[in-house]
Amino acid sequence: MIGDWRVQQVARVVRAGGVIAYPTEAVWGVGCDPWDEDAVLRLLALKERPVEKGLILIADTVEQFDFLLDDLPERWLDRLSGTWPGPNTWLVPHRGRLPEWITGRHDSVALRVTDHPLVKRLCALTGPLVSTSANPAGRPAARSRLRVEQYFPQQLDAVFNGALGGRRNPSVIRDLRSGEVIRPA
């Protein structure tokens, strides 16, 4: 088990504007503080990902997303009920409450409450994190720390070692408004 000191150390890196890699439910992810524009733009540059595409935010509890979920129609909240924590990412209207470097050209943002124990502990200390697969655009997502280090040699501020969550595929992505599956699991 990863010690609390290591979780705290990686959380300090995130709060200081660092870009980190960490295991998720299915693949390795890279992330940073979503409120730190410089960190997000650096992460996007590492991945060669255009800002217009938008990013996923992960959290350890639904409450970390309350500022985005309050005032939503009850039928939408019913769709979320029972799907978090877990491998379910929802496109939620952001209503101008998030910066464009997170949302890209979209009127919604992708949100997931993780069930990965290590990432939950990290998000408990940092708040929500940007979470995107650890790979340059067009390359397969990293499934090992070695592959992360090959993709991003000496470009990350911390690599939070741990085991993947055992899922075969990244999370399903659904639109909260329609319930439509955007990306199957």
From Swiss-Prot:
Q: Which GO terms describe its molecular function?
A: ATP binding; double-stranded RNA binding; L-threonylcarbamoyladenylate synthase; tRNA binding
Q: One GO cellular component from the entry?
A: cytoplasm
GO terms for biological process?
A: regulation of translational fidelity; tRNA threonylcarbamoyladenosine modification
Key words of the record: ATP-binding, Cytoplasm, Nucleotide-binding, Nucleotidyltransferase, Transferase, tRNA processing
Q: Which residues form the signal peptide?
A: none
InterPro entries in alphabetical order: DHBP_synth_RibB-like_a/b_dom, Sua5-like_dom, TC-AMP_synthase, TC-AMP_synthase_SUA5
Q: What is its EC number?
A: 2.7.7.87
Parts of the chain that traverse the membrane: none
**YrdC-like domain location:** 4-185
* Reactions this protein catalyses: L-threonine + hydrogencarbonate + ATP = L-threonylcarbamoyladenylate + diphosphate + H2O
Places the protein is found: Cytoplasm
Q: What protein family does this chain belong to?
A: Belongs to the SUA5 family. TsaC subfamily.
**Its biological purpose:** Required for the formation of a threonylcarbamoyl group on adenosine at position 37 (t(6)A37) in tRNAs that read codons beginning with adenine. Catalyzes the conversion of L-threonine, HCO(3)(-)/CO(2) and ATP to give threonylcarbamoyl-AMP (TC-AMP) as the acyladenylate intermediate, with the release of diphosphate.
Protein name (record): Threonylcarbamoyl-AMP synthase
